[in-house]
């Protein structure tokens, strides 16, 4: 498991980041949010569709997006495009999760991907690596 006390390289303080999780399966979404809150110093907000995600970014500026590919109303690629077209969010790293992912589309957009079922340690390592790069 990642070190719960991820420290800022400058002054040793803990850098708390915000993560927007977009997952329509409530069991998986709650699992991801709980894993983030229990195993990292970061905060996660769960929404269940693309429209809720677009509304959420009017109130928060996440440091990481975690998107399911198969969402109601729009797929994860369409949501990624809308989120990253928003001023100030163009360079926010993104993890796309699904049992079936369109690899070519992910590569064109430099989206990180994980297949379902998720391996928790792999998920937490990727979250830590992406957020650590933004410290």
Where in the sequence are the language-model features?
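Non-catalytic signal-transmission and effector/linker regions of two-component phosphorelay proteins
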Residues: 1-20, 119-135
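Two-component/phosphorelay signaling modules centered on CheY-like receiver
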Residues: 25-45
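Acidic, metal-coordinating helix/loop segments flanking the phosphotransfer/catalytic sites
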Residues: 46-64
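Acidic catalytic/metal-coordinating carboxylates
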Residues: 49, 75-81
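Active-site residues of response regulator receiver
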Residues: 68
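The feature encodes the CheY-like receiver
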Residues: 72, 90
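Alpha4 helix (beta4-alpha4-beta5 surface) of REC/receiver domains from two-component response regulators
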Residues: 78, 99-116, 121-125
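Hydrophobic/aromatic residues positioned on beta-strands within the core alpha/beta folds
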Residues: 95-97
């Amino acid at each position: 498991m990642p070190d719960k006390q991820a420290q800022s390289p400058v002054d040793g303080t803990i850098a708390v980041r915000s993560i927007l999780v977009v997952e329509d399966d409530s069991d998986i979404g709650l699992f991801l949010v709980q894993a983030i809150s229990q195993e990292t110093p970061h905060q996660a907000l769960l929404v269940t569709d693309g429209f809720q995600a677009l509304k959420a970014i009017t109130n928060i500026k996440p440091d990481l997006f975690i998107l399911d590919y198969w969402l109601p109303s729009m797929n994860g690629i369409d949501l990624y495009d809308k989120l990253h077209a928003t001023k100030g969010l163009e360079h926010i790293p993104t993890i796309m999760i699904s049992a079936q992912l369109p690899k070519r589309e992910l590569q064109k957009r430099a989206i990180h991907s994980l297949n379902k079922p998720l391996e928790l340690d792999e998920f937490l390592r990727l979250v830590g690596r992406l957020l650590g790069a933004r410290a």
